[in-house]
Amino acid sequence: SIATERDFRQNLQGVRQIADISFVVPRVNWSSGTTYSAYDDSVVGYPTPNFYVITGANDVYLCVQQGRNSTGAAVASTVEPTGNATTLVKTADGYIWKYLYTVGAYSASRFLAGNFMPVQFIDSADSSSPISEIVQETIQNAAINRQVIGIAITSGGSGYASAPAVTISGDGTLATATAVISGGVVVNIKM
């Protein structure tokens, strides 16, 4: 109402126009010797455990499969993920990462802080957009809906003399997985 607007204006202390804004998440720097968790949308309390990282090159990756040793125990990450491919990044330490985006120079100078890092969704990018936005849009557009990129073991069973066959049913193609056993128990599924 007019009375409400007048009351607001009379009691106004000050207004400041904001030019640059960004969504942010807690910053998680990739660090050798750290154990990262694979992303799991059923876990509450994110961002703990750490399931994403920002590298020294300001590339952001999502951990889709944790590195594991021959007995199925989680191992620390020792190889920093690199590259901006639309495919998964497999590192020598057994981790599998999904490249998400690069924090460009402009975003880094304004929103990258010691405790937080910017995130964004690119609706559309054109030839006048920063290269980081064009690459991010390419990555977003290459995402495959309902793609199986990891399998979590909830019960490894017992008594296996050899690795059982892993069958993936669905409407896609080329999905393969191999079971890893230790002591007669399935301890890992490698995609």
Could you say what each language-model-derived stretch is?
Residues S1-V60, V64-T71, S77-D123:
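Extended assembly-interface regions of large multimeric machines
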Residues Q65-A76, G156-S158, G170-T173:
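Acidic glycine-/aspartate-rich tracts in secreted/extracellular proteins
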